[in-house]
Amino acid sequence: VLGFYGPAWLINYTIAPNSGEGDNSSAGDWACCAPNIGFFWGGTWLLAGKNVVDTEKAELVRDFIHWVTLDCTEDGLQYKWANGTLNGEGGTKDCVASGTVMAKSNGELDFLGGQNMFDAFVPANAYANGKNLTQYDESINTAWRDAVRQYAHGEVDRDTAIENFKITVADTLGLDVD
């Protein structure tokens, strides 16, 4: 395999656990780089109800949301998450929303041969925007996954999978598909 396009979590939660064990492991042979094209698909949301009438509870909610989203100090959630210290030392280092946090964090992974993954992820954040999002994205992604799954399981050939995908998108969403 030459490489994969994917979200930051692909490294820790998909590739690494499936890289083999012992002498058959490819751990340490992997690296990551900034993409030549951007990728963005939503994100994680944190919401709070606007009708909290108890001032003390409202302040706690405010402080919690600030800690999760905006606190870039070493005591903030994103810093602890990025550095693998959320539940004490030795946790999984992970990409976080804050480029500020990643820029000052240690993203070195043994799986990546000691590479600091944040050196690739921080510049890649410039590509993350929602300008290409549409109301059709989830439906199109589902149709694509279904077509690829049929092809991967040998149920259809490549051309049929592509044609089925186009038909599904056109029929389901009423879109013109070339």
Segments predicted by a language model, with ranges:
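Extracytoplasmic/periplasmic substrate-binding proteins
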Residues: 1-63
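Sec/Tat-exported extracytoplasmic proteins
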Residues: 8, 14-18, 68-72, 148, ...
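Solvent-exposed, acidic/flexible segments
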Residues: 37-38, 54-61, 133-141, 154-158, ...
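Non-transmembrane alpha-helical segments in soluble domains
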Residues: 49, 61-73, 77-79, 145-152, ...
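Charged/polar, low-hydrophobicity segments characteristic of intrinsically disordered regions
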Residues: 78-81, 174-178
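Long, aromatic- and glycine/proline-rich binding clefts that accommodate carbohydrate-like moieties
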Residues: 79-146, 150
